[in-house]
Amino acid sequence: IGCHVMFYEIDMVEEYLNSVHLALQDIENKENVKVEMMWNLSQYFEECESGEKLFEIKQRINDLENKYGFYSLFYEQNDKPYTMADYRRELNNQCNECDYVIWGESDCLMPRQMFGVLEQLKEHSNQQGIHRFIATFGIRKMWDESWKVLEHPEFTNKPYYSMDTPEDTKLAESSPWSIRYTMSQKEMDEVNAKTSDLDVEMIAYPKFDGSGLIISSDLLRTGANIPPAVYMNGDDSSFLESCRLHMGENYRQYVIRNI
């Protein structure tokens, strides 16, 4: 599992790291999970306010490393851009080292049940002869019906707030089912604690965004990846089309709706 972090995201990323740390607590073979962080300290797009501030950020990274024990990479060139798309393209190339590649994101919380669920999926997919697939966890209420298949059962029948008006903006930022609401680890744990049996649906068409995306390594070995021309927005949608191209009529996506 790998995550690209810009230097100005340093104050928010610990929640993500803590969620991965908690997910690791419930598995025995922790040594088989590689947690990687790409720290982008480049000032190509945005300048750090001072050299002193950049030093503080590096110290903070060191503190987080000592606390959570992840593997760090750094990008520090100021004359050449490096983006999340660049990192995820490289992360996908680690497919020969593992069963899955997972796209972390600095503002995404990973569920505690993640690794246990993935072990179950691996066992099931091997039994069924399904080796190339995507897996996604449940998401909150989205803006149109095309996302309904991915929405968590607790949120799918809730209203969507568009933030077009001050009233809708207030509702969007205060309603737990809204994608604009900042859900805490505790709140996510409470939702997931209600699940006793997994609600897993298989879909035969690609539908996902980039946060928390789980990719089987056998799919990546076919060549599915983010095209080199993509370097800013669109890494998830371009990868979606690459998956569609490489799997064709055999596209498979596990949707774990109630986690």
PLM features: what roles do these ranges have?
Residues 46-98:
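Active-site-proximal specificity loops/subdomain of glycosyltransferases
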Residues 31-47, 76-78:
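Short beta-strand/loop segment that forms part of the nucleotide-sugar
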Residues 92, 111-217, 221:
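Conserved catalytic core of nucleotide-sugar-dependent glycosyltransferases
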